[in-house]
């Protein structure tokens, strides 16, 4: 479990730490291991996977979930149109996004190829052939979808699959802080996308979905899982 702040130092003034996240994994029956890593820094990423190789010798599942476009340090958006928005928003979305995904995946794949098995899940926020109201965001998300398609082509011979997974409006800490909760009927818990990841990772035929951008809601129908409260949202 990587990517959040550690030992009380904060990322974007958020109080949550990677130790807390790892503890949550352990509490749910897994084994959470907190590792500090800046996924936009190639040295950090290389060091992370060197440690994984030394300790485990392989990696079976990689979930890329990084997005830098919401940081409070970014300038306030000047308007809705791309020429009214700061280029810093574009840089943040692409660097802490598609760039970080590629850096991480290119270090993970060599640990998947020897056993001829692996799954890369790239978290995205929109499906192919949809248009966002924000050009920078649209390009950032479609870059993730496109890289997933090309990954499928290059990884197929090694039996490694790549899927772009699109959750709905998740009830993250930011969303909860903004006043949204279960009563709104539109948000979903982070466990919902987690269950989608588990469904994909345990599907012996996941290669049939490789290269696609798929909504969590579609997978909920296919695999028959629900959110923790028993609901099953079907629209993004």
Give the location of each predicted region.
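Short-chain dehydrogenase/reductase
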Residues: 1-56, 67-71, 75-81, 85-89
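Active-site loop of short-chain dehydrogenase/reductase
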Residues: 30-31, 58-59, 112-125, 157-161, ...
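A short helix-coil junction within the Rossmann-fold of NAD(P)-dependent oxidoreductases
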Residues: 55-56, 69-74, 107-119
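Conserved hydrophobic beta-strands of the Rossmann-like cofactor-binding core
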Residues: 62-66
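Catalytic loop of short-chain dehydrogenase/reductase
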Residues: 68-72, 79-89, 93, 102, ...
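C-terminal helical subdomain
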Residues: 164, 182-236
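Short, flexible catalytic-loop segment of classical short-chain dehydrogenase/reductase
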Residues: 166-177
């Amino acid at each position: 479990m990587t990517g959040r702040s550690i030992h009380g130092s904060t990322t974007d003034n958020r109080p949550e730490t990677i130790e807390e996240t790892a503890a949550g994994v352990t509490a749910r029956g897994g084994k959470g291991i907190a590792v500090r890593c800046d996924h936009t820094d190639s040295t950090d990423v290389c060091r992370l996977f060197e440690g994984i190789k030394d300790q485990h010798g392989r990696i079976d599942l990689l979930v890329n979930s990084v997005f830098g476009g919401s940081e409070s340090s970014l300038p306030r958006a000047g308007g809705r149109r791309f020429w009214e928005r700061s280029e810093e928003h574009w840089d943040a979305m692409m660097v802490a996004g598609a760039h970080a995904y590629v850096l991480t995946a290119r270090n993970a794949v060599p640990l998947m190829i020897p056993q001829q098995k692996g799954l890369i899940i790239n978290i995205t926020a929109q499906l192919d052939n949809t248009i966002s109201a924000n050009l920078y965001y649209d390009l950032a998300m479609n870059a993730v979808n496109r890289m997933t398609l090309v990954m499928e082509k290059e990884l197929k011979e090694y039996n490694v699959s790549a899927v772009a997974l699109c959750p709905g409006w998740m009830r993250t800490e930011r969303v909860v802080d903004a006043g949204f909760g279960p009563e709104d009927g539109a948000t979903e818990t982070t466990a919902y996308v987690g269950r989608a990841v588990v469904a994909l990772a345990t599907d012996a035929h996941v290669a049939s979905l490789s290269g696609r951008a798929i909504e969590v809601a579609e997978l909920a129908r296919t695999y028959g899982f629900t959110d923790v409260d028993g609901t099953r949202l079907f629209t993004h």
